[in-house]
A protein has these predicted regions:
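Metallo-beta-lactamase
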Residues: 1-94, 98-110, 117, 122-191, 209-216, ...
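Active-site flanking residues adjacent to catalytic metal/cofactor-binding acidic residues
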Residues: 58, 105, 125-126, 194, ...
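Catalytic metal-binding/acid-base residues of hydrolase active sites
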Residues: 61-63, 108, 129, 193, ...
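Core dinuclear metal-dependent hydrolase active-site scaffold
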Residues: 4-7, 46-50, 56, 65, ...
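Cap/insert and terminal regions of metallo-dependent hydrolase folds
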Residues: 75-87, 208-253
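Short glycine/proline- and acidic residue-enriched helix-loop micro-motifs
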Residues: 32-33, 69, 151-160, 232-242
Length: 253
């Protein structure tokens, strides 16, 4: 068995590098590398794991542009018929109903849309994340697409404004895990808290060694390699990301 990972981009989300990509303490060091705070579009990636007995998807990506702009980060971009997860799967020869398992790094809005299209899939997330997603502090209502934020008769799924993972026919298929767990041979998950309370990382064993689908634990490669000056002055060996609920957990992750 030879597992492969295929990246599928579900759209683009605007972010400010010095506020989002990097912790504020990194500012003067990454600026010397040419990083500015000018808004930049980050791709919102999902990952298709092929080659095993079951077809596995890591996250399902963001919502359509209008919803993303109104409730989350604007100006976002999801090109209809191109970037949504159903279209991305079609481009590589699959339908959502072909997917056997969807693993969620976490349950933020930009990782969980269009779940109703995956009619045969098992849905798996971390137990802590599932619990928190249903009872977040108000600061995170938008992140978890809680119905209390709905405006103007807007809907997210069918005819109601609801977190996609709470839809009838979807919620019943969710399973939760905790700790380090093998999902199928060659694919395992472990807890990588910090960005949110119940974030998890997916590890895929390939012919070239293990690959890690890290969700939002790492935004850019600059997060994992601190400039030498930062190492000398701050004793950092990483440039931690700027978006987190627990910086200690994020660092240890």
């Amino acid at each position: 068995m030879s597992l492969t990972i295929r990246p599928l981009n579900s759209g683009y989300i605007p972010t400010k590098p010095l506020e989002y990509w990097y912790h504020f303490s990194c500012k003067k060091y990454v600026e010397k590398m040419g990083i500015t705070n000018e808004s930049d579009q980050l791709p919102d990636m999902t990952f298709l794991i092929e080659g095993g007995d079951q077809l596995i998807l890591v996250d399902t990506g963001m919502s359509w542009t209008e919803h993303a702009d109104k409730y989350h980060h604007g100006p976002s971009l999801q090109r209809p018929g191109i970037d949504d997860i159903e279209s991305r799967l079609a481009q590589v020869g699959y339908k959502p109903s072909d997917v056997d398992i969807v693993l969620f790094t976490h349950l933020h809005w930009d990782h969980i849309f269009y779940l109703e299209k995956f009619t045969k899939a098992r849905f798996i997330c971390n137990e802590v994340e599932w619990d928190y997603a249903h009872n977040p502090v108000p600061l995170h209502y938008k992140s978890y697409c809680r119905p209390i934020i709905a405006k103007d008769g807007d809907v997210t799924c069918g005819n109601e404004f609801i977190a996609p993972y709470d839809q009838e026919g979807v919620k019943e298929r969710f399973e939760t895990v905790k700790g380090e767990v093998e999902i199928v041979p060659g694919v395992s998950v472990y807890e990588s808290f910090g960005h949110c309370p119940g974030h998890m990382t997916i590890v895929v064993e390939t012919e070239d060694g293990p690959y890690f689908c890290v969700g939002d634990s790492v935004f850019v490669m600059g997060n994992v390699d601190a400039p030498q000056e930062m190492q000398d002055e701050l004793h950092y060996d990483i440039c931690p990301p700027g978006r987190y609920v627990d910086i200690v957990a994020a660092w240890q992750t």
